[in-house]
Amino acid sequence: MRPLIAVVVLSAFATVQAQDKPAAEPPPPWQQGKPAAMSESTLHPFFPHLAGRSVKELPVEKLKVPAGFKVEVWAEGIPEARSLALGDKGTVFVSNRLSKNVYAVVDKGGQREVKTVLKGLNAPNGIVFKNGSLYVAERDRITRYDGIEDRLDNPPEPKVVVDNLDPQKQPGHFWKYLAIGPDGKLYFNIGAPGNIVMPNYMQASIMRVDPATGVLETVALGVRNSVGFDWHPKTKELWFTNHGRDWLGDESPNDTLHRVSKGVPNFGYPFCHQGDTPDPEYGKSRSCKEFTPPALKLGAHIAPLGMRFYNGKMFPAEYRNNIFVAMHGSWNRTTKQGYSLMRVKVDEKGHAKMEPFLTGFLTDEKADPPMWGRPVDVLVMKDGSLLFSDDYNGILYRISYAK
Amino acid sequence: MRRVLRRAAASAVALFVFSSAAWAADVEAGRNKAQVCAACHGPEGNSANPAMPSLAGQPAQAIATQLFQFREGNRKNPQMSPMAANLSNADMNDLAAYFSSVQPTPPKRRAAPQNAAAGQDLTKKFHCVQCHGPALRGQQHIPSLAGQQADYLRAQLEGFKASSRADMDGNMTSVAQELTDKDIDVLVDYIAGLGAQ
């Protein structure tokens, strides 16, 4: 008996010793998980021009779309334009992560007017519009603004749908995407609190809340950070984009596109990446077989953000129910890729294939910065044209088709 | 030879990118708009007042980002908030282009000998160099710290520690929580002295 006690006491002592040793300060979230071999790497994220950049100084003529399509600037001067939501009366609402405002773009006979409608919000990245109300997902809560389209100059007070979503003020991926499902529930992500860390029970997930009751449910787990989702118009299945971890090299792991077909799947983070690549640290005692694989690998560090199924009537018939994905573009890669819109064709069995749809932002894959603009979200307009946002410059572009 | 050519081509591209960026916002327009700034920030943005930050040589995006945050009320200061309230986006980009184009002339100040090595260690321990760069000269929206005015640096660090200084992504507030008063003394002395080197 005695030797056992001694062992217990000794190990307790060792634990205390370990805690007494001053720990290294945690690095900023984007540097977290960087291996010693990459300590000299100068790769870094790209920061948007918050005051925007004028179209006049940008090479917009470099943007390329397939034959028959046309791309043009639709509105500018919208700081850090990110998520897009379409009002019943045609107002385009535009969110951001860092500017604390929500903007509205009103089309007045070919002229677009930009208004600041909401101010002082906490990372209001997620927005969605339904039945006259704008819902906003901030860092810590989701709110509702009723009848806002008639009151853009004097918006109503928010009504809280759900609160206390960020009790620990988590670092890392603290911004949220927001969408309304066919079930009328609000779907949102809670990102991982760093590059590669063990999430708590609510983090690295997609959740949903019933706006009528406030009841929360988990939709998917093991999702490092999703900043775009939509439902297949026919199957009604949820599809979403996901960002893989950083600092595993130029080609690994892929960012991914996922499909939720049944139950509450776990897609593997932090144990397994892209369905088949165990994490060097967290994957040691787990198997990728435990987790649901992605529907499609999109490319390493390509940063897929907003995605929508095309349900408009303007584009040729073969585009119907295809997904447009906005690729914000890689930073954690020595040779950059992305900064584009991709077209993903999916069949009803969930098979997916990807091809470029809009390119031209990437000008030099080795330069810093390598691009002059970055797509964030896509939105199908009532006439079937496609809007997309560029947070780097604060610009919205419109893609249309004519035979 | 091939490698040399490739390198030459790369630097030509870099030059082009730089000049097109400078052309984007208007340095001369910025110089005119910046006249009012000199009262506090010094001639050409080189401050001689320990409480006022120098703007000369800052990355353009760092200037524009802070002006934007002041204008939107996300960062508040009794002197700066009213100055920024009526700036247009073009004003902010012009001012940023101008100040970033000016050669900084930091005060001839050196850190106390005991703080020089200790300060450098702290900038590694607290990961300052990860975002502000190995020489603490900033990048993109991250300000240059090297040779910045000491009292200004102290006020920002103490503000981040007290969670009262505006912080977009929480990184500075988070790291400042671990700073002791002594750490702040050493860091301020070390960083403010980097301009003289």
Predicted regions and their residues:
Chain A
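Beta-propeller domain segments
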Residues: 21-66, 175, 192-195, 201, ...
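Surface loop/turn motifs at the tips and blade-to-blade linkers of beta-strand repeat domains
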Residues: 73-78, 115-120, 161-170, 218-222, ...
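Beta-rich catalytic cores
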Residues: 80, 98, 113, 120-123, ...
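Conserved beta-propeller blade signature
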Residues: 91-94, 133-136, 185-189, 237-241, ...
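Short loop/turn segments immediately following the C-termini of beta-strands
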Residues: 96-97, 139-141, 147, 191-193, ...
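A short loop-to-beta-strand structural motif that recurs across blades of beta-propeller domains
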Residues: 101-104, 141-143, 205-207, 256, ...
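Asp-box/WD-like beta-propeller blade repeats and closely related beta-sheet repeat scaffolds
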Residues: 114, 123, 128, 140-181, ...
